[in-house]
Design a protein with these regions (language model features):
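Cys-His-centered catalytic/binding microenvironment captured across papain-like cysteine peptidases
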Residues: 47-59, 122-154
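C-terminal motif of bacterial Sec signal peptides marking the signal peptidase cleavage site
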Residues: 13-16
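Generic recognition of long tandem-repeat/solenoid scaffolds
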Residues: 89, 114-116, 151-157
Length: 195
């Protein structure tokens, strides 16, 4: 009799075990990532105007013995426009307000990512290797989307790991770039070098 009771208890334990788990998400991972990329694409390309990219090149550095800042030290402004896989870019680092066009793609790396695939002298300025900058200058051409809040898209550079932002440009592109260059000249004339 003990044998039957033991077998009955053993079988009841086996039948009560279920290897099935409830799904945590309603959609599969591939569908979720596709929808996230699509939402960022709609935000970027849905805006007819320009975006201001606050760009922080360089591997995250420390300053005066203090811990490394997430945005490195100093930043640059790029003005970009996204449409149909093409990006138009201009920046304060250029001597003119001329725009340059190249291509970009969306992909999944550590998260939803935008990559500037083709060479663009403006966007690749900090990626350019020369005799002076043998390891380039820590620039990024791939950015991971972190979040979108109140019209501000927060990105993280895949190379530098620095945080950067994209905000909608409300004024004139050329006026913004000219004002940035004017401020740089004012600092240089005072013996200060803008970071």
């Amino acid at each position: 009799m003990k044998k039957y009771i033991t077998l009955l208890i053993a079988f009841s334990f086996l039948t009560s075990c279920s290897y099935k788990e409830d799904n945590t998400f309603e959609q599969k991972a591939s569908n979720r990532t596709t929808s996230v990329i699509e939402s960022y694409k709609n935000i970027l390309e849905g805006h007819d105007g320009y975006w201001v990219l606050s760009y922080y090149p360089g591997v995250t550095r420390s300053f005066g013995g203090f811990p490394a800042a997430p945005r490195s030290l100093g930043g640059y402004t790029f003005v970009v426009k996204f449409k149909d896989g093409k990006v138009t870019a201009s920046s304060e680092i250029s001597n003119t307000n001329a725009e340059e066009e190249s291509y970009y793609t969306y992909s999944i790396t550590e998260g939803p990512t935008i990559s500037f695939d083709t060479y663009n002298s403006i966007l690749d300025h900090f990626r350019f290797v020369s005799a002076v900058f043998t390891n380039a200058r820590g620039g990024d051409i791939e950015f991971i989307f972190l979040k979108e809040e109140n019209g501000v898209i927060t990105l993280r550079g895949r190379t530098s790991n620095n945080l950067m932002t994209l905000t909608k440009l409300t004024g004139d592109r050329e006026a913004l770039l000219n004002k940035l260059r004017e401020n740089t000249q004012a600092l240089n004339s005072k013996g200060l070098n803008p970071i």
